[in-house]
Amino acid sequence: MHHFVPDFDTDDDYVNNHNSSLNHLPRKSITTMGEDDDLMELLWQNGQVVVQNQRLHTKKPSSSPPKLLPSMDPQQQPSSDQNLFIQEDEMTSWLHYPLRDDDFCSDLLFSAAPTATATATVSQVTAARPPVSSTNESRPPVRNFMNFSRLRGDFNNGRGGESGPLLSKAVVRESTQVSPSATPSAAASESGLTRRTDGTDSSAVAGGGAYNRKGKAVAMTAPAIEITGTSSSVVSKSEIEPEKTNVDDRKRKEREATTTDETESRSEETKQARVSTTSTKRSRAAEVHNLSERKRRDRINERMKALQELIPRCNKSDKASMLDEAIEYMKSLQLQIQMMSMGCGMMPMMYPGMQQYMPHMAMGMGMNQPIPPPSFMPFPNMLAAQRPLPTQTHMAGSGPQYPVHASDPSRVFVPNQQYDPTSGQPQYPAGYTDPYQQFRGLHPTQPPQFQNQATSYPSSSRVSSSKESEDHGNHTTG
């Protein structure tokens, strides 16, 4: 692949030369420029400027064919190409066409069409100059076009269209300056650097190239520039998007952290409130329970004191002993009630545990006074009916009856008379045994009718006995 070195210059010093060179063109060729196609090329042939349409790939025949320059490898440079030089007078600028404000991306993105290939001719070499030593050590290192980026302000502010013309002018001016002492290969190598103008990143086309009337650079090596432009746009967008993503992620993490802190604080407050409420309820329940227990114990103590007062001779302090005493006392009371409910004719039975309570029972019933035993038989009616008195029958038939005198007051039992309780059993007639002698101490007081009848019978019996003794004495004497 061979590169053609175009003859162009964009310095302001060569504006007059450009105007003078355009005057040599016929008017027909000038008027037809730009009518058929926007992309035109100006060639220098035999001291004349020739217009060539790049899309149609047509060029005017020339008397002398253009000389081709082989592509120069940066590692190897032929010595034959070092003798070729370009004079300043033979270079004419053709890039002074009016610029258009089109899409900014068109300056960086190109299609790999065959129309991007430019041709150039070198008219003549005037004089041979000494070769210029060019070594690999003196060359600046080629920069990596994949790492350059554009400012984010152009994308954010939408001013890409405004910076397009300025960037294109800067690119043309930086890339089209060729020193008279440099070879085309050296100029190409020096112009193949990435330069930054007015805060914007731009790339210079290596090896020179053709330019259209819009002021846009058409690269000689189209594939490399295409990769460069595409990478620049991709890198710039990828730089913007990660930053936005990082900002969003940071904000999202901050919101999540804030939400988490608020949730944790609320949960802690809720737990504390629940614990405090539960502890308060438990303390209140404990207080109520303690108060009820205290009241219940007080009532029990009062009842035990009252029971201790009711039980006689109860000196127990503990509750169990007091309850035992109360149980025994209730049993004794039950027995007393049974004895009182029985009739007078039925002798109550003596239980084993009644001896200790007998004095208390007598005091409660008014029986604390000793009861004197009667001096007569308790049932005189039955005895009188069973055994009639013989003296009365004998005296009834023998003579007039004598009136029964009243009994001797000294012989009648008087309640006010002092009675000796230490004396033995009452005196009964000889050969008579009392059948109720064993129950006399427990039997209640005798009915009053029995006493009256008993008081009359002994006197009559005693009177009759005295009469019998007198009659018996008289009968023996007479």
From Swiss-Prot:
Q: Compositional bias (Polar residues) at which positions?
A: 415-426
One Pfam family cited in the UniProt record for this chain: HLH
**Which CDD domains does the record associate with it?**
bHLH_AtPIF_like
Q: Which UniProt keywords apply?
A: Activator, DNA-binding, Nucleus, Phosphoprotein, Transcription, Transcription regulation, Ubl conjugation
PTM sites of type Phosphoserine: 202, 464-466, 469
Q: Where is the composition biased (Basic and acidic residues)?
A: 238-272, 284-294, 465-478
Compartment(s): Nucleus
Q: Which PROSITE patterns match?
A: BHLH (PS50888)
Cite the record's note on assembly: Homodimer. Interacts with the photoactivated conformer (Pfr) of phytochromes A and B, PHYA and PHYB. Also interacts with APRR1/TOC1. Binds to RGL2, RGA and FHY3 (via N-terminus). Associates to PTAC12/HMR/PAP5 which acts as a transcriptional coactivator. Binds directly to PCH1 and PCHL; this interaction facilitates its association with phyB and its subsequent light-induced degradation.
Q: What is the name listed in the Swiss-Prot or TrEMBL entry for this protein? A: Transcription factor PIF1
